């Protein structure tokens, strides 16, 4: 089913005609049904999660479909499939509000990118693509901003740059 690009959101009446040309069992019926046209898609929106940062969209599990990664005020870092379902290994329980958007980088040189984000209690987490903890680091203060990832010193290893509310 498709709709005109100018169609209004809401319930759209759809008249379905059912016919059988079988001579032994002729059949004809007309059924009126309503189809709901909305901007939501299967699995979305996700309710009961307060998100105050931008999501990261990437295909980290190699299935050729992008996943959605984000932190929330319930202290969990989520990984969702294209249909809004939790990925295996997610959510990761960081224990504190996550307002930092995530960044990506291959921090252990295994050619697989990891996720990095911060919490309201100064914890910086690096997660493997499957939601398991790779490493963490504590810095005094709240990490509200997204970490930046770059090879700052040219040694082929990525550095993580972030700030805290305490100017650290």
Q: What is each residue range found by the language model?
A:
Residues 13-17, 54:
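Beta-strand secondary-structure signal
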Residues 2, 17-21:
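Beta-strand-rich extracellular modules
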Residues 1-2, 131:
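Accessible peptide chain termini
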Residues 21, 25-168:
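Extracytoplasmic/lumenal domain signature
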Residues 5-14:
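Short glycine/proline/serine/threonine-rich loop/turn segments at secondary-structure transition edges
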């Amino acid at each position: 089913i498709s709709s005109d690009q100018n169609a209004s959101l809401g319930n759209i009446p759809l008249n379905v005609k059912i016919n059988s040309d079988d001579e032994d069992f002729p059949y004809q019926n007309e059924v009126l049904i309503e189809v709901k046209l909305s901007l939501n898609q299967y699995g979305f929106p996700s309710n009961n999660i307060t998100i105050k940062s931008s999501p990261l969209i990437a295909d980290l599990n190699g299935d050729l479909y992008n996943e959605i990664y984000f932190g929330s005020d319930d202290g969990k870092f989520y990984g969702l499939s294209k249909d809004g379902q939790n990925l295996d290994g997610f959510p990761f329980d960081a224990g504190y509000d996550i307002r930092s958007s995530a960044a990506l980088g291959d921090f252990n040189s295994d050619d697989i990118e990891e996720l990095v984000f911060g919490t309201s209690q100064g914890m910086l987490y690096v997660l493997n693509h499957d939601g398991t903890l790779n490493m963490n680091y504590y810095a005094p203060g709240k990490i509200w901003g997204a970490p930046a990832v770059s090879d700052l010193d040219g040694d082929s290893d990525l550095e993580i740059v972030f700030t805290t509310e305490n100017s650290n």
